[in-house]
Amino acid sequence: MSMIITILNGPNLNFLGKREPEIYGTETLKDIEQFCKECATRLGVRIHFYQSNYEGQLVEWIQEAIGVSAGLIINPAAYSHTSVAILDALKMFTGTKVEVHLSHIYHREAFRHHSYTSAAVDAVIAGCGGDGYWLALEYIVKRFNRNK
């Protein structure tokens, strides 16, 4: 059985391609999901890809990944700046965790410079657009293989 990596996307990411394309680009979340599936196939892993606008749903998916997924990629979107609940759920997940942001959050408004959720992850990738997901997938697979 191949390794599973869970990919979670937070609020408003379902509007990628339409919402502020000058910041987030024109790729849709479906484009990113397809790209992740192609990358996963090349890397020999499986992905579970989800999006929700609801904090509690993201927490539940993190909990469901415990003991199932070797790694977790999360783009918590605006919840990165507010959610202690997601932070606490991420702390419970013992696999490799990567936080991804499409935009460079440190080049944006000051309130976006602090991420609560990043305190519980192994790496943060910001400002690479959809390629950040590929970088996160590759990092998780390399780290898993190195620690076998």
Swiss-Prot record:
GO molecular function, one term: 3-dehydroquinate dehydratase activity
PROSITE patterns: DEHYDROQUINASE_II
Chemical reaction(s) catalysed: 3-dehydroquinate = 3-dehydroshikimate + H2O
Protein's recorded name: 3-dehydroquinate dehydratase
EC number(s) reported in the record: 4.2.1.10
Residues where substrate binds: 75, 81, 88, 102-103, 112
Gene: aroQ
Keyword Lyase: yes
Pathway(s) where this gene product acts: Metabolic intermediate biosynthesis; chorismate biosynthesis; chorismate from D-erythrose 4-phosphate and phosphoenolpyruvate: step 3/7
